[in-house]
Structures are given as C-alpha cells and as structure tokens.
A protein has these predicted regions:
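Conserved, structured C-terminal
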Residues: 1-166
Length: 166
C-alpha cells in the first residue's frame, strides 16, 4: 500500500515508472478516511477492531491502518468509494464528526510534524527535518548516500520548529 498526498501523486508515479516498479493505481476507486483526534481510537474501537500502531489489517473489503501521524492517535480507513457514504454514516452514528483537511493540518502543525511537499521536499531530508527515526535500516534505499553523509558529518541545515506562547 502506498498512500501519498494528492499534490505528490504524479511525482510518486513518475518515480515508480522510472524504476520499473509495477503497481495498481486505485486512486479513482478507493477512498481514504482518517479518523483522528482526542477520542478517535476509543470511539471507533466500539465497532471495528483496531490494529496495533504502525500496522494494517483487513476486514472484508476495508483496510484499517495506524500508520499516519498528525499529532493525535487515529486510524486510516481505506475502502471502495461505493462504500464510503455508508461508512461515514456509521462513523457519525457512533459520535464521530466529519471535518476537512484543514483540521488534519492544524493537528500536525500543533505537533510540529512536517508534511512532504511542504516542510519536507527533495531539498529537505528527514535528517535535516529532525526525523531521523523514520529512516530505514536497510542496506540500500533512495538517498542513502546523502543521509549517511549528513548523519556522519552533522554538517547540514536543520529545520527548526517554534512554539508560540500566545
């Protein structure tokens, strides 16, 4: 499963195509609903079985994941778009209110979590953004040489976050 922000979709597809990686693009038939917030896990756990953090599980034709990060705990729900409204109605009938992407951005900004395409780009690495914990331990990956050099030399820019006391 590969989920990217809509603004990065073409870039990701180009990368996959250039590297001859086979994939099935389900963008037009699949929806993603992120259920996040203070009581999200407690509320959604009343009618679905929640996976462990950083894992996924499939029930019928719905995939549940706890792989996102926004500053609040939650679960991402991937389902066929013909089933989306029924699922949204189920959420609402269980006390979970809908909100937009602006809410997600507010949560992640309050938690100082960068978003690829905005605070993270081709020019800003995870090391520079203070996200070294997200880097794989595999022997080889795209950008490994740059990452290794930044970790070793410590001579790189640092993305800094500020908390305003207002």
């Amino acid at each position: 499963i590969l989920i990217c922000n809509a603004s990065n979709t073409n870039k990701i597809k180009t990368h996959l195509d250039i590297n001859s990686i086979n994939y099935e693009d389900l963008t037009m038939t699949t929806d993603l609903i992120a259920v996040q917030g203070k009581n999200a896990i407690e509320l959604i756990n009343t009618f679905i079985s929640i996976p462990d953090k950083f894992s996924t599980q499939k029930e019928k034709d719905i995939i549940y994941a706890r792989t996102g990060y926004t500053g609040e705990d939650g679960v991402e729900v991937m389902l066929d778009n013909k089933d989306t409204m029924d699922f949204i109605n189920k959420l609402e009938s269980n006390g979970i209110k809908a909100c937009g992407l602006g809410s997600r951005d507010t949560l992640r900004l309050e938690a100082s979590l960068p978003l690829y395409g905005f605070e993270l780009t081709d020019e800003i690495t995870p090391v520079e953004a203070g996200l070294k914990w997200t880097i794989t331990n595999k022997d080889d990956y795209l950008g490994k040489e740059v990452i290794d050099e930044q970790i070793t030399s410590r001579a790189h820019k640092h993305l800094k976050r500020f908390k305003l006391n207002a």
